[in-house]
Amino acid sequence: MPTISSHVLNSENGTHVSDLTITLSHLKEDGKKEVIFSSKTDKGGRLSESFTIDLSEDKIFELEFKISDLFPKKEKGINCNDLIFRISLNSREEKFHIPVIISRHGASTWRSGE
């Protein structure tokens, strides 16, 4: 069973980001999205979700971090709304960890091996 995990930190005040909605959707060949899970980070800014899906072939997913819930638009100009990763999974046992450091003006992330 594949697992998606994350740890989200707020670069503006150095805290863990709790209650941030993270949604994983499967992008189907017809362009439609099927939500696999939608969960919130815990008090420590962490989320870990395992899910069941047929991964006999590569599948494309979108992992969305709903940053706009944390930082409502306050200023004129460009603000970071939501962060979306498009990822490919093809292993039933894959663990995919994405740490994210966010602010209202951007984000920094990387894929971390476990």
Over which residues does each language-model region extend?
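Beta-strand-dominated extracellular/periplasmic modules and repeats
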Residues: 2-86, 90, 97
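Compositionally biased low-complexity segments at domain edges in trafficked proteins
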Residues: 93-114
